[in-house]
Regions:
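Alpha-helical scaffold elements that line and support the substrate/ligand-binding pocket
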Residues: 24-43, 60, 96-97, 110-139, ...
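Catalytic loop of the DD-peptidase/beta-lactamase superfamily, centered on the K-T-G motif
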Residues: 1-22, 136, 167-295
């Protein structure tokens, strides 16, 4: 297990040579921040239709666009298990019948990696940059992060701590898969939510969540929800967490931030062979300990 803690903006873990780890779906939070920077700069509005589609950027970011997800396909799971190369994106959409919306945008909720693939394409179109360069210029670099990049090949993942995913083709993550040190994930989220990369209004929009039912067995959530690229919800003690959990072959990452008055803490944990709930529980324990120590 690897972990990193930021308390009141200061990295608590000692300086060390850190391994790279896959950020899995925490990448969505980075993509959301990049997309919201486009809103900040007037290149698009949250409620504008995206790429000539019937859904808006807000609906994509919050998984309300009506899109399906390739995780529903048995042949997808079989191909990943067999270490097969990723299908081209157009083949994935054809196999999924991805152009057929599953519900009218804005009327339901369905977690969709395909939605974030649309967001990645939108970022490239509106910036006239590659996704790599757009994310670096608009999100990573402004927040002081430099050792984070997209994994493009199996060889890229072989450089990470997650040995069990070394034969996994990162192109299966159609919206892109970031890799970086665990401390950089904690710093990214903490700085995103407490600096002026995005204006207060956009940060409020980002953290305005759609409530998704009640407590989840084996997870810390009492009222889980999803905002614009962030998992947002309450836990025991009346605290509200904001961040994201991600999982891939053999490993899980969870990155969350909590505030209590003027105090804040942000924890990132990566573990191989663990469940999402187990890793989230470690994050919650670290956050609560950090708040107690500040008290």
């Amino acid at each position: 297990m690897l972990s990193s803690l930021v308390s009141n903006g200061l990295l608590q873990t000692p300086d060390r040579l850190e391994p790279m780890v896959p950020w899995w779906s925490f990448t969505k939070t980075v993509l959301a921040a990049t997309a919201l920077s486009l809103v900040r700069d007037g290149l698009i509005r949250l409620d504008d239709p995206v790429l000539d589609q019937p859904f808006t950027l807000r609906q994509l970011l919050r998984h309300e666009a009506g899109l399906a997800d390739y995780g529903e396909l048995a042949q997808y799971h079989a191909a990943v298990s067999n270490n097969e190369p990723a299908w081209p994106a157009n083949e994935m959409m054809q196999r999924l019948d991805g152009a057929q919306l599953r519900y009218s945008p804005g009327t339901g909720w369905r977690y969709s990696n395909v939605g974030y693939w649309f967001i990645a394409r939108l970022i490239e179109r509106l910036t006239d940059l590659t996704l790599d360069d757009a994310v670096i210029q608009r999100a990573l670099c402004p927040l002081g992060l430099s050792n984070v990049r997209f994994a493009k090949t199996r060889a890229d993942l072989q450089t990470t701590h997650s040995a069990s995913s070394s034969n996994y083709d990162p192109a299966w993550v159609y919206h892109g898969l970031l890799i970086g040190p665990i401390s950089q994930a904690a710093l990214f989220l903490d700085r995103l939510l407490c600096t002026d990369l995005l204006c207060p209004g956009l940060l409020l929009e980002m953290q305005t969540a759609r409530r998704l039912g009640g407590p989840i067995p084996g997870r810390p959530w009492i009222t889980p929800g999803y905002g614009l690229g962030v998992m947002q919800g309450s836990i025991d003690g009346g605290y509200s967490l904001c961040g994201h959990t991600g999982c891939g072959p053999g490993s899980v990452i969870a990155v969350y931030r909590v505030c209590d008055g003027d105090a804040s803490a942000c924890s990132a944990v990566f573990a191989a062979g663990a469940s999402e709930g187990a890793v989230e529980a470690i994050v919650v324990a670290q956050l609560m300990q950090a708040l107690r120590q500040r008290g």
